[in-house]
């Protein structure tokens, strides 16, 4: 697979998914500003855990203040969206500079988590749970 290197100053778009959440990221060189669905990062993700997920790829390449991120996240919950953003940012960084691939791969940031919610089966109250069994 050949990687085409994108000019360093042009914006880069990438997509990431987790469970039912989808995130689209536009990454461009800047001073570390992050906007998700038109809101600032601190307002969209009030807890540190979610913000850490988004910044993890940038911390690995030591570029937290090098890039501006404009993102759209939809579907799922906050953690699913944060993890979808993490994958999207990682993919965008590789498009920006393919040499980041080994660093991000080593940290497991390029793997799409395939786990999804298991469907509810007929004749049971949930995916695995059974109705109470009565012998008599």
From Swiss-Prot:
The keyword Protein transport does not apply. Keywords: Ribonucleoprotein, Ribosomal protein. InterPro entries: Ribosomal_Su5_D2-typ_SF, Ribosomal_uS9, Ribosomal_uS9_bac/plastid, Ribosomal_uS9_CS, Ribsml_uS5_D2-typ_fold_subgr. Residues 117-136 have a biased composition (Basic residues). Residues 111-136 are annotated as: Disordered. GO terms for molecular function: RNA binding; structural constituent of ribosome. One of its GO terms (biological process) is translation. It holds the Pfam family Ribosomal_S9. One of its GO terms (cellular component) is cytoplasm. Gene3D superfamilies: 3.30.230.10. Belongs to the universal ribosomal protein uS9 family. NCBIfam families: PRK00132.1. HAMAP family: Ribosomal_uS9_B. This is Small ribosomal subunit protein uS9. It comes from Methylacidiphilum infernorum (isolate V4). The lineage of its organism: Bacteria, Pseudomonadati, Verrucomicrobiota, Methylacidiphilae, Methylacidiphilales.
């Amino acid at each position: 697979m050949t990687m085409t290197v994108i000019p360093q100053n042009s914006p880069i778009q990438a997509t990431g998914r987790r469970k039912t959440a989808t995130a689209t990221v536009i990454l461009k060189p800047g001073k570390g500003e992050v906007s998700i669905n038109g809101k600032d990062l601190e307002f969209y993700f009030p807890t540190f855990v979610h913000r850490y997920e988004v910044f993890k790829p940038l911390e690995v390449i030591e570029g937290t203040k090098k890039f501006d991120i404009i993102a759209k996240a939809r579907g799922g919950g906050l953690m699913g969206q944060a993890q979808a953003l993490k994958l999207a940012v990682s993919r965008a960084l590789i498009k920006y500079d393919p040499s980041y691939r080994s660093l991000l791969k080593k940290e497991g940031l390029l793997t799409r988590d395939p786990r999804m919610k298991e469907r509810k089966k007929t004749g049971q109250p949930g995916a695995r749970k059974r109705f109470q069994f009565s012998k008599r």
